[in-house]
Amino acid sequence: MDFHLTKEQLLVRKMYREFAENEVKPLAAEIDEEERFPMETVEKMAKLGMMGIYFPKEYGGAGGDVLSYAMCVEELAKVCGTTAVIVSAHTSLCAAPIFENGTEEQKKKYLPDLCSGRKIGAFGLTEPGAGTDAQGQQTTAVLDESGENYILNGSKCFITNGNVADTFVIIAVTGKTTDKRGRSMKEISAFIVEKTDKGFSQGKHEKKMGIRGSSTCDLIFEDCVIPKDRMLGKKGEGFKIAMKTLDGGRIGIASQALGLGEGAVEEAIKYTKERVQFGRRISQFQNTQFQLADMHTRMQAAQYLVYAAAMKKQNHEPYSMDAAMAKLFAAEAASDVTRRAVQLFGGYGYTREYPVERMMRDAKITEIYEGTSEVQRMVISSHLGVK
């Protein structure tokens, strides 16, 4: 696989890096401390096309590619995990499933506003009793007597962008069906929900360990009325759509983890070259050099996995296992590398005077959302034929 970036990719990467350094980094500590969603940053990203990078221009997108999107999330995460996941969830979990599964009318209606950043997107799959077990959905969607609307009842939890989003892709149970072995199972479908829909509400902001500026909340459906033409895909295709959406989402989260780890390495190199102990810069100690060598190597390996998955998705090749491998490795590498960075900083690393403690807190969630590390191992082993 050719990992050489094109001239255009190098240019947009430079733009993302400069934007992250000049516009995102100065606010990162503040939005973490205040648990504040950085709407002003989202508006600036929208003007640069960063909210719809790999969608066609005919739908309002930037007309870029999936690798450019991954690099955008990566560069943002180097300085702010919160801002990175805002773009990832909006793009991979809302705009992407509409683009990949929607009717032409749905794409023309929703994508221009999402790609321009006029509206923010979110995805509702996780429920209080259905996290890793996506088949455990309890939210229902029942066709009303007129046959024109679905009535949704239930709730979703831990929804990224939840309190600020305008457009949601929601997974709900629409009946019962049977599997290939004749066993009864839930029929699951996908819907597009708008913030203004009757019977829909958003819950309180969750107080989190990391990505504290990210809006995370419950979504509540109480006889929520959804026109039937807002079903995404066909009836009963919701589980397939959800799994396909998560495959793409894992590239986004792997990119977030990659950026967090790389950012921690950069901070650690800079600090160890300045910090003096026992009359020497601590970068001169062999232990420090070996630590940094291991940290950089892990993140370089993670980058290859992430870029490979992104390129396979762009080329319309099967990429489910690649996305799972990228997320598994990048997430666990980021958690390890950010922890090591804090250790290299010593007591200062444990304070908020430096960003590495925030990076460590932000990195942990990448091992959990959009499929835990254990789920990624299940996905990978399944593709290997180990069942």
Where are these regions (language model features)?
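Flexible, glycine-rich active-site loops centered on histidine and acidic residues
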Residues: A95-N101, F123, Q135
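A short, Trp-centered hydrophobic/proline-enriched beta-strand micro-motif
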Residues: G117-L125, I171
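Short Gly/Pro-enriched turn/cap motifs at secondary-structure boundaries
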Residues: G129-T132, F158-N161, R181-R183, K208-S215
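A short core secondary-structure module
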Residues: E148-Q202
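Alpha-helical interface subdomain recognition
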Residues: M1-A89, N101-Q106, C115-R118, G131-A134, ...
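Flexible, small-/acidic-enriched active-site or ligand-binding loops
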Residues: G136-Q138, K198-V225
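Short Ser/Thr-interspersed hydrophobic loop/turn segments at strand-loop and sheet-helix junctions
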Residues: G49, V73-A77, A172-V173, V193-K198, ...
